[in-house]
């Protein structure tokens, strides 16, 4: 059964187990998926409201975009765990002869590169979610300000959690060019995503405090 098909209780029990996977990477993807789901919710709560009739098309489009992000982030949960299992298998390869050592080293290198892709994808998806949220500031149902804020925090957690996974995987690579490229890509997403998250959270905190 894929991780996204588990119950909430079942998934948290898997995380809490002694097994190293699923772990932080899949949890980061789930955090992002929750943020995307809340974005879809906030957009949905804006639809059909006379007060927001001028932004109905925007809300409908945002709802669809957020739900698409949610599904892709749920898929990333499984992808992260599967690539981790791949590199774990590489570390378990025999290393008695020079040939075995070379084969093991090569498999580990390829496995670590593969492990870098899901968290980078999660960062990209969370960045898209934060961009979508920012476009909705002041245009969604005001009664859902706290939900909007939690969406922002969840997407931020997903992005920064995935970044930690990018860093730990690239830190073990011998291919420094690949590692530098992956880190540069992740840093670029942080540089645009985190200020967006700060703006969205500050506005929602102010909105909630005014009530």
Residue ranges and their predicted role:
Residues 3-22:
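Short, hydrophobic/aliphatic alpha-helical segments
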Residues 17-40, 144-162:
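Conserved phosphate/anionic-ligand binding catalytic regions in large, soluble enzymes, centered on
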Residues 30-34, 62, 69-76, 111, ...:
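Amphipathic alpha-helix face/heptad-repeat signature
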Residues 41-53:
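Transmembrane signal-anchor/signal-peptide helices with a preference for the extracytoplasmic
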Residues 50-89, 189:
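A structural-propensity feature for long, helix-poor, extended segments
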Residues 79-94, 197-211:
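Long, charge-rich low-complexity segments
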Residues 80, 84-153, 157, 169:
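Amphipathic alpha-helical interface segments
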Residues 122, 129-132, 144-204, 210-211:
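Preference for long, well-ordered alpha-helical segments
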């Amino acid at each position: 059964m894929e991780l996204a098909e588990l119950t909430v209780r079942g998934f948290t029990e898997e995380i809490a187990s002694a097994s190293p996977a699923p772990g932080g990477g899949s949890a980061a993807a789930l955090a992002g998926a929750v943020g995307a789901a809340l974005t879809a919710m906030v957009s949905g709560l804006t639809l059909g409201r006379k007060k927001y009739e001028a932004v109905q098309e925007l809300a409908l489009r945002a709802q669809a975009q957020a739900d698409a992000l949610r599904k892709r982030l749920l898929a990333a949960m499984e992808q992260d765990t599967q690539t981790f299992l791949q590199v774990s298998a590489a570390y378990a390869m025999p290393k008695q002869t020079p040939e075995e050592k070379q084969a093991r080293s090569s498999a580990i290198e390829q496995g670590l590169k593969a492990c870098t892709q899901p968290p980078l994808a999660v960062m990209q998806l969370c960045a898209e979610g934060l961009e979508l949220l920012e476009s909705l500031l002041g245009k969604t149902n005001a009664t859902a300000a706290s939900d909007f804020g939690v969406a922002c925090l969840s997407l931020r957690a997903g992005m920064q959690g995935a970044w930690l996974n990018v860093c730990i995987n690239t830190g073990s690579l011998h291919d420094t060019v690949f590692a530098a490229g992956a880190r540069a890509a992740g840093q670029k997403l942080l540089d645009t995503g985190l200020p967006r998250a700060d703006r969205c959270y500050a506005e929602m905190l102010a909105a909630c405090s005014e009530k």
